[in-house]
Amino acid sequence: MTLVVVTGATRGIGRAAAIELARRGAELALVGRDPERVKAVAAQAQAAGGAAPIGEYVADLTLMSEVRTLAEKLRDRYERIDVLANNAGALFASRKQTPEGFELTFALNHLAPFLLTNLLRDRLAGGRVVTTASDAHRSGVLDLDDLQSERSYSAMRVYGTSKLCNILFTRELARRAPELHANCFHPGVVRTGFGKNDNGIWKILTTIGSPFFRSPERGSRSLVWLALSDQAAQLNGEYVEDERVVTPSHQARDDELARALWERSAELAGLRTDVAV
């Protein structure tokens, strides 16, 4: 039985993926911020066909201390993890800083999956890492001297940059840990509660455009495909849309930038820079 850890599992793409993965017979460990929501999705996944007890984990992934605690709990329970789905993410209207000193978008969307993946690396040997990226990465510009967006803040640009980080992380993870299958995907523009923290253009667009957006179930297909399919087992370091490999932006294919981001992220997360080499 394939064990899949899903972060951001309580709504949208994560919830839809969890239910479909359970329907296909996967064992699940679900991660979310709200214990009641985690419990509710676990029950829905179990009803969809989950054959094994579903692990329920509560963590605020904007805090690296909670990422570390989550990793410890997962390591204590599971000797092997077949798939880690780094799905948790959000967009924030204004710049906020976590108690640990990180800009909120960067912490949740990039640093948390970077740290969690590295802390679980030995449990993932031979497995898959699937990260939810976005075509919004094309609007992002990564400045290694301003990872915390202190010079200026635009919600969509900062979100796009965090998704660019996801692709660069995936690319560098594939290079450093070739025994893994690390890939990321664009889910499309999905009808979810995503962007509810934004009071600007994204909130307007989601209100007007919602009838034309994809369902969470449609948006989750590439996640499920990358997690379980035989075809995806042949991929490493790729960016996928609609279950096919596509080419990301020029900056997303910059190997030197990917290496530099990895080293800076390891430093910020308190990891050795040679982790996963």
Features from the language model and the residues they span:
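Short, flexible, mixed-charge acidic loops at enzyme active sites
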Residues: L142-L147, N197-G200, Y239-V240
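Metal-centered catalytic cores of metalloenzymes
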Residues: G188, N199, H250
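A short, mixed-charge helix-start or loop-turn motif at secondary-structure junctions
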Residues: T7, R151, A155, L205-G209, ...
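A glycine/serine/threonine-rich, flexible loop-to-helix segment
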Residues: R191-T207
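C-terminal helical subdomain
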Residues: S162, C184, T206-V246, R253-R259, ...
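C-terminal amphipathic/interface module of NAD(P)-dependent oxidoreductases
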Residues: Q251-V277
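A generic structural signal for short coil/turn motifs at secondary-structure boundaries
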Residues: F92-S94, P248-Q251
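Rossmann-fold NAD(P)H-dependent dehydrogenase/reductase core
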Residues: M1-G193, L268-A276
